[in-house]
């Protein structure tokens, strides 16, 4: 969830952030320097799941794992990974611009994940609360401003993105699950990365 450590590798945003690391995700660029972003292949994970106990995962819905190279090419290694996932019964589309999908998911993560963790509500319960929905819309509007500044195309509306999330019954996003389990929260990749980009680009 959130923006990956390799996000600006060959990103072509025409901003000063191209080919730099995100401090909020990768402090001092340690992952960038150690793993090298050329080794990265991006993946947007859509299934809604819950860890019931170690080794036991409850799958609520979803079977799509969108894949993409940071440079947007459809490489042989990308095709191979996609083929393996498809042969396993999953959907694994190969994307030339995975970053758009990363932001569509981030759109929900930065709002629903955080407010579910703060309120303890499931996604469908959030959909029934006008006050929370109003706050979610405002958060998504701010996220969209930042994304568009670095070339992201939001091909669905805020209302449709909200409908998609709140249609999932009885599910709490991973941030709320982590909070309830006493695990570290993924706040920096989900929220901190957006704030960092906004500050660096004076948005």
Predicted regions located by residue number:
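NAD(P)-dependent Rossmann-like dehydrogenase/reductase catalytic/cofactor-binding core
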Residues: 125, 133-203
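Rossmann-like NAD(P)(H) cofactor-binding subdomain of soluble oxidoreductases
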Residues: 1-52
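Internal alpha-helical scaffold of NAD(P)-dependent oxidoreductase catalytic cores
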Residues: 32-105, 110, 114-155
């Amino acid at each position: 969830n959130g923006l990956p450590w390799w996000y600006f590798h060959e990103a072509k945003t025409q901003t000063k952030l191209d080919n730099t690391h995100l401090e909020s995700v990768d402090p001092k660029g340690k992952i960038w320097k150690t793993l090298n972003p050329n080794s990265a292949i991006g993946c947007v994970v859509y299934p809604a799941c819950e860890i019931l106990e170690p080794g036991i995962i409850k799958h609520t819905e979803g079977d799509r794992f969108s894949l993409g190279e940071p440079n947007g090419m459809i490489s042989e290694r990308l095709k191979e990974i996609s083929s393996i996932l498809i042969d396993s019964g999953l959907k694994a589309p190969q994307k030339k611009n995975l970053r758009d999908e990363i932001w569509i998911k981030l759109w929900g993560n930065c709002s629903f994940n955080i407010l579910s963790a703060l309120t303890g509500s499931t996604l469908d319960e959030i959909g029934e609360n006008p006050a929370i929905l109003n706050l979610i819309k405002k958060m998504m509007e701010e996220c969209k401003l930042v994304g568009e500044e670095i070339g992201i195309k939001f091909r669905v509306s805020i209302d449709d993105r909200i409908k998609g999330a709140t249609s999932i019954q009885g599910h709490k996003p991973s941030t709320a699950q982590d909070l309830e389990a006493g695990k570290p929260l993924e706040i920096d990749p989900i929220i901190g990365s957006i704030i960092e980009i906004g500050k660096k680009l004076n948005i």
